[in-house]
């Protein structure tokens, strides 16, 4: 890369990086500006999401009252921007509203202490009290009751959906939740007219639920990336992902979008939902206005209404790679000015490398691309200080192959195991693996994480070879982030803390490399853990599996060195015991008699 070309690129990148695509206007009343930009319907939806994500135990009706009051105030400010308090920031207005709730301390305890702070510390305090694992009952869809609610009051139905999802997922990407609420309403508009409502509704609700849970996990990872590793980490992630998806767009264009995408997500992660949604709409508008230079896959997206448009852009298919790309080695190994370019503008040079490498490797996971970029950076940092830098970094690309081989081999082995055992058996294998690695982690967390890790088989193993790596590693990043988020609240394992905090891009390799914890002191055998009742027979299959897997974790915590043969025998006997009692005329009586015998059996097998 010639120096004059690089300087031109640096100037363009620096300008785009600092400026982005948004205008940074100031307004007399921020809340009036957002209300006018978003419109009343979306404004009310976003305010409802904001309150629900902070006050997760509050009844829906209380939130509706708060939303109504904020909306009326916003309308006052639209009519007269100089009216009392209209010049206050949205953070201040929102925080004041929370702190005015009389029962705040009674229902939320320490959250009320935040009210003694000033902005922005008060808002940061509110964020720290969000609960990623709230004690809220699982929703069980009743098609007849739901259709009755939908037909009685569509607006309330829409609001309750936002409320229920937001309070269970306090970092859900708010404008995307508005999109899913539209899809949810559409499902009910169609299925509540059907003769068999359940047959129409239940598969569609389950399909939507999977998409919503994945969306929640993706946003939680983005927020964790920004909160724990800084904005630069998120920008690097976005640069790699967008370069893969839009390989025809030039580096400066991608950099502009990355800068503003970081702003949008930082706003949503910090609870600035109105500004986040407004800026996301502006970014979608910019991308569509410039789609000719960004991607050929956006036309269909750009013809859609706002929420569908933004969602469609985020999920857009990868564009074809330009045919005239030079080999990467030309600019990043063979060019004699590599060290000069690197030293003069490290971030731009490394960003260019990541952009060029990512657009050529749509089959790699983002984490792998970032690990490769880290190795390239470390090599230049070392070589550019030596007497003959070109000779030193001449073989840098050879260092990348082991980074690629490691996840490929791991995925191959695990997919073979998945094919052999099936999903439930594969989950059990992962439960054994992770309980031995980090037995200090709570049993519910180990079961949840292992079950989700096990889903990588059905999600990714049947995909074409060129899609497997990115599918598996990107999905595993979401699941391991869930483990890290839960563990941060109640840290019990130094190994988990180390893997979670040292490097975002090396999390998965760190967890994969963990060995069984030989320092762990086994738990005492608790008979109550292996006591079961008649309700086990009527549980849905997934809940029945969770009961069995919970027992498996507890078994391993008692006997961490149990052999595969011992565990297989115990699980086989357990299945036979459950089958016998669930087939008996009196389930409870059978469990009462056979249960103690089963416990004696377990202890004998593991002795």
Curated annotation (Swiss-Prot):
Compartments reported by the entry? Secreted
User: In what residue span(s) does the Albumin domain sit?
Assistant: 19-209, 210-402, 403-600
- Say where the protein is mainly found: secreted
Residues that the record marks as modified (Phosphoserine) are 29, 82, 89, 442, 512
Residue(s) carrying N6-methyllysine = 557
Q: Which residues bind Cu cation?
A: 33
Q: What is this protein called?
A: Albumin
Organism annotation: Sus scrofa
Q: What is the lineage of its organism?
A: Eukaryota, Metazoa, Chordata, Craniata, Vertebrata
């Amino acid at each position: 890369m010639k120096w004059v070309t690089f300087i031109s690129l640096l100037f363009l990148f620096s300008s785009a990086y600092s400026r982005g695509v948004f205008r940074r206007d100031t307004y007399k009343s921020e809340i009036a500006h957002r209300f006018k930009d978003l419109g009343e319907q979306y404004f009310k939806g976003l305010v409802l999401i904001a309150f629900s994500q902070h006050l997760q135990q509050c009844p829906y009706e209380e939130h509706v009252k708060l939303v109504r009051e904020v909306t009326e105030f916003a309308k006052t400010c639209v009519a007269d921007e100089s009216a009392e308090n209209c010049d206050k920031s949205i953070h201040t207005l929102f925080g004041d509203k929370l702190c005015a709730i009389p029962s705040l301390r009674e229902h939320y305890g320490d959250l009320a202490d935040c009210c003694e702070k000033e902005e922005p510390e008060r808002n940061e305090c509110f964020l720290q009290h969000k609960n990623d694992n709230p004690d809220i009952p699982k929703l069980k869809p009743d098609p007849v009751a739901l259709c009755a609610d939908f037909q009685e009051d569509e607006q309330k139905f829409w609001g309750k959906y936002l409320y229920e999802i937001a309070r269970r997922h306090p970092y859900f990407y708010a404008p995307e939740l508005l999109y899913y609420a539209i899809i949810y309403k559409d499902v009910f508009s169609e299925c509540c007219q059907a003769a068999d409502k359940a047959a129409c509704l239940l598969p569609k609700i389950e399909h939507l639920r999977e998409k919503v849970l994945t969306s929640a996990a993706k946003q939680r990872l983005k927020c964790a990336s920004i909160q724990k590793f800084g904005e630069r980490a998120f920008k690097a992630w976005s640069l790699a992902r967008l370069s893969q998806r839009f390989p025809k767009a030039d580096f400066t264009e991608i950099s502009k979008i990355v800068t503003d995408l970081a702003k949008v997500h930082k706003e949503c992660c910090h609870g600035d939902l109105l500004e986040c949604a407004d800026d996301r709409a502006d970014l979608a508008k910019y991308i569509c206005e410039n789609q000719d230079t960004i991607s050929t896959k956006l036309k269909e997206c750009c013809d859609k209404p706002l929420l569908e448009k933004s969602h469609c852009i985020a999920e857009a298919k990868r564009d074809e790679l330009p045919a005239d790309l030079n080999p990467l080695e030309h600019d990043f190994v063979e060019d004699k000015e590599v060290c000069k370019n690197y030293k003069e503008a490290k971030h731009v040079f490394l960003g260019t490398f990541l952009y060029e490498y990512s657009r050529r490797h749509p089959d790699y996971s983002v984490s792998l691309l970032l690990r490769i970029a880290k190795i390239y950076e470390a090599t230049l940092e070392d070589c550019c200080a030596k007497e003959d830098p070109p000779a030193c970094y001449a073989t840098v690309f050879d260092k990348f192959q082991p980074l690629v081989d490691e996840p490929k081999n791991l995925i191959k082995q695990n997919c073979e195991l998945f094919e052999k055992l099936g999903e439930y058996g594969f989950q059990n294998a992962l439960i054994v693996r992770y309980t031995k690695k980090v037995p200090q982690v709570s049993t519910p967390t180990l079961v949840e994480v292992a079950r989700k890790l096990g889903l990588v088989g059905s999600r990714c193993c049947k995909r074409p070879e060129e899609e497997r790596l990115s599918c598996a590693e990107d999905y595993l990043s979401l699941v391991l982030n869930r483990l890290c988020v839960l563990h941060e609240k109640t840290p019990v394992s130094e190994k988990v803390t180390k893997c979670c905090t040292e490097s975002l891009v090396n999390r998965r390799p760190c967890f994969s490399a963990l060995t069984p914890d030989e320092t762990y002191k086994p738990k005492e055998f608790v008979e109550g853990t292996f006591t079961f009742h008649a309700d086990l027979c009527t549980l849905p299959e997934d809940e029945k599996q969770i009961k069995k897997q919970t027992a498996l974790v507890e078994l391993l915590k008692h006997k961490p060195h149990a052999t595969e043969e011992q565990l297989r025998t115990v699980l086989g006997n357990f299945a036979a015991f459950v089958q016998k009692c669930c087939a008996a005329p009196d389930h409870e009586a059978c469990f009462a008699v056979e249960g103690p015998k089963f416990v004696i059996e377990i202890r004998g097998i593991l002795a």
